Amino acid sequence: MTCEHWRGDSAELKNERSRAITLLCLMDWQAFWLTFRLAVIVTAVLLALGLPIAYWIAFSRWRWKFLCEAVVALPIVLPPTVLGFYVLIALGARSPLGRWWQSITGHTLAFTFEGLVIGSVIYSLPFAVQPFAASFSAVDRRLLNASAVLGVSKFRTFWRVIIPLSFSGLVTGGALTFAHTIGEFGVVLMVGGNIPGVTRTLSINIFDQVQDLNYSAANTTSLVLLLIAFVLLSVVYSFNRRVWSLWPRP
């Protein structure tokens, strides 16, 4: 059933339902589901990549470790256009990665959904790694030493001791990554452009609607992003508060 049909019948409906239907009709659902898919994929990738990186940061004794921490934190302070520009160059047809990808698929990574995933992973890296590393560092070293004395492997200790004790940090990192990916704009625009159904996310859609002076549609999409971010952060804070309330006091 089309939006036009709903608008035609809205005079016979209650005002509240009419306004809700109008808001739904103003929403770009193609951009919504593309953004949601991007956020899910980026969060999953950063869970896989972020855990080993965070583990190394938390437990490594290398004297130059701070350089790696600085590299991980760079996306927080760099302007999105700067980061997006260098990611775009790295994914272009003249780069080794771009040539390799083009030899396999026949097209470059730039201005594709796959390229968007890579750019978003880089841009959201600190939002996953830093909470992970902080939660790993907070694990009582006596438990790790006891595990080593008992002959338990580091791999098993990681999954049986560190991960359960760091679960609140993992939830925080995952939620921040998801929320940050949904709201990305600069890197998304630089790396993916504005291709409907391919790289146009909700943030790009808002930009388009504002340029077209379509403030009603821009407001609807902005409210959706605001609601998603608020709900995610509320769930994270509620979860962490419950975890800390159950944590034994010294």
What spans do the regions from the language model cover?
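Transmembrane alpha-helix signature in integral membrane proteins
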Residues: 26-57, 70
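C-terminal transmembrane helix and the adjacent membrane-cytosol boundary/short C-terminal tail
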Residues: 64, 133-144, 148-149, 219-250
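Cytoplasmic-entry segments and transmembrane alpha-helices of multi-pass inner-membrane transporters
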Residues: 56-87, 144, 168, 250
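Membrane-interfacial helix termini and adjacent extracytoplasmic/periplasmic loops
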Residues: 22-23, 84-121, 191-195
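Transmembrane alpha-helices
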Residues: 44, 129-132, 136, 140, ...
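Faces of alpha-helical transmembrane segments in polytopic inner-membrane proteins
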Residues: 49, 71-80, 107-133, 164-168, ...
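Non-cytoplasmic
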Residues: 93, 170-207
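Interhelical loop and adjacent transmembrane-helix boundary motif
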Residues: 24-30, 191-230, 234
